[in-house]
A protein has these predicted regions:
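An N-terminal boundary/leader segment
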Residues: 1-53, 289-291, 364, 482-489
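Serine-dependent amide/ester hydrolase catalytic core
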Residues: 13, 301-302, 325-433, 481-487
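Short alpha-helical scaffolding segments that buttress acidic/His motifs in well-ordered protein cores
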Residues: 25-29, 308-309, 355-363
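Residue-level signal for inorganic ion chemistry
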Residues: 29, 51, 104, 223, ...
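Structural helix-boundary/capping segments
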Residues: 35, 113, 164-169, 175-271, ...
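Short helix-loop capping/hinge segments that flank enzyme active sites or metal/cofactor-binding pockets
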Residues: 71-91, 253-262, 315-386, 437-453
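Short glycine/serine-rich loop/turn segments
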Residues: 71-213, 266, 315, 401-419
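General small-molecule cofactor/ligand-binding pocket signal
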Residues: 119, 293-298, 439
């Protein structure tokens, strides 16, 4: 039996049935990481020793009947912007290259309490700023489907790790599409929950009003199970919402009869690759054949999402990243004259070019004389976009959209063209601005053999509708792993 080809829930069942031990599961993941990591570069930190020690502890708790959940004993990879006590947490930046947090992020803690074994921390765009995982100080992650292409970003390490079967599932964070877009590029499933569903405590902030942690896995069942485990009300996060229910697995039902699905005309016009469009519309046809009612509608306001997002996110980032100054933790320049020079040199040497670009942009839009013209206008635009979605959800249960305008671009193509990189988030950003849930599922491949993902968007707190729709489509299409993951089997 090949352990790494199992989904997280399948592996959990086999551990429970004593067909596989937790140590065997962890060793299988470590062996796969050692086999493909030189090509893919999904991880910034691999904690072999800690994972094996934890595997033995978890096995004992399972044997004693103290851990019975579906993810008990299943290994996981964590995006490197979530604090893990005692384990390096770098945000893929030089400035945090030596940072070991004193506490663990709430979402990660929830997983640990459910018996998860952390394999290590995954690569990402520096401070989650980017769409290709090329801005990482620790080198780019490569797409397991084609090593000359990017995995997407900023959670590219998490999505590539799942696609390459280095981990059964992973956690990512999504500020403007950072779970959904790389999931599409890597042919895996990723959920960005409603804002406030998963605690942000211990997530190193980029854009606080937009950031949300979510799962990445091989199928919808895994994602729903992980989301059910990490979602919780947390008084330590002032934006955390006490929900009536955190039950997402009951939505794993193969039925879309009567489900009203809206297709925004504005998402399927110019700028969308023909093969991506064809694959998504084919998937919509499948849902229609299964009884869904599909209709086109107008959502023209979304064209203002990108400028609004980059003003708001950069403004919040310039404030959030002020704490990295070389004083309390992280990198400090070796030679400096006086305090201000130390700040300046530590930040200039510690941050990469994309992070500096966004800090400067954010500082500019918040400066006196420009605040009203940019930041305030962006906040008003955000409110209008939310209203447009509210109106759409009066009529539709689920909105279908692409996750990205193309399949995964080649390495280096977007990195040198910031506008091109920013436009890559065109279909995902509005979901963050409106605080909505979204899921990406693989629906096919283009002529180069690269995965195409379809994004399903739901109303606030209606994850179950998008999970049910995604699950229904998934019953018609078996999961496919890239050749790189299957070599030597």
């Amino acid at each position: 039996m090949d352990i790494t080809s199992l989904t997280a829930v399948e592996l959990g069942k086999k551990i429970k049935a004593k067909e596989i031990s937790v140590v065997e599961a962890v060793k299988a993941s470590i062996a796969q990481i050692e086999k493909v990591e030189k090509d893919v570069n999904s991880f910034v930190t691999l904690d072999k020793e800690g994972a094996l020690k934890r595997a033995e502890e978890v096995q004992k708790l399972i044997d004693d009947g103290k851990l019975t959940g579906p993810l008990a004993g299943v290994p996981v990879a964590i995006k490197d912007n979530m604090c893990t006590q005692g384990m390096l947490t770098t945000c893929s930046s030089k400035i945090l290259g030596n940072f070991r947090p004193m506490f663990t992020a709430e979402a990660v803690k929830n997983l640990e309490e459910a018996g998860a074994v952390i394999l290590g921390k995954t690569n990402m765009d520096e401070f989650a700023m980017g769409s290709t995982t090329e801005t990482s100080y620790y080198g780019p992650t490569k797409n397991p489907w084609n090593l000359e292409h990017v995995p997407g970003g900023s959670s590219g390490g998490s999505c590539a790790a799942v696609a390459a079967e280095e981990a059964p599932y992973a956690l990512g964070s999504d500020t403007g599409g950072s779970i959904r877009q790389p999931s599409s590029f890597c042919g895996v499933v990723g959920i960005k929950p409603t804002y406030g569903t998963v605690s942000r405590y211990g997530l190193i902030a980029y854009g606080s009003s937009l950031d949300q942690i979510g799962p990445v896995a091989k199928d919808v069942t895994d994602c729903a199970t992980v989301l059910e485990t990490i979602a919780s009300y947390d008084p330590k996060d002032s934006t955390s919402i006490r929900r009536d229910s955190y039950d997402f697995t009951s939505a794993l039902v193969d039925d879309v009869k009567g489900m009203r699905i809206g297709i925004p005309k504005d998402y399927f016009g110019n700028g969308l690759d023909a093969e991506v469009k064809e694959n998504i519309l084919r998937a919509v046809k499948v849902l229609e054949e299964k009884g869904a009612v599909v209709e086109e509608f107008d959502l023209s306001l979304v064209k203002y999402a990108i400028p609004a997002y980059y003003v708001i996110a950069s403004a919040e980032a310039s404030s959030n990243l002020a704490r990295f100054d070389g004083v309390k933790y992280g990198y400090r320049t070796e030679e400096y004259e006086g305090l201000h020079n130390m700040y300046k040199k530590s930040r200039s040497e510690g941050f990469g070019p994309e992070v500096k670009r966004r800090i400067m942009l954010g500082s500019f839009v918040l400066s006196s004389g420009y605040y009203d013209a940019y930041y305030l206008k962006a906040l008003k635009t955000k409110a209008l976009i939310k209203k447009a979605f509210d109106k759409a959800f009066e009529k539709y249960d689920v909105i279908v959209a692409p996750a990205a305008p193309t399949t995964a671009p080649e390495l280096g193509k977007s990195l040198n063209d910031p506008i091109k990189m920013y436009l890559g988030d065109i279909y995902t950003i509005s979901v963050n601005l409106a605080g909505l849930p979204g899921i990406t599922i693989p629906v096919g491949k283009d002529s180069k053999g690269l995965p195409v993902g379809m994004q399903l968007i739901g109303n606030c707190f209606e994850e179950n509708k998008i999970i049910q729709t995604a699950y229904t489509f998934e019953q018609t299409k078996a999961y496919e792993a890239p050749e790189l993951a299957k070599e030597d089997r």
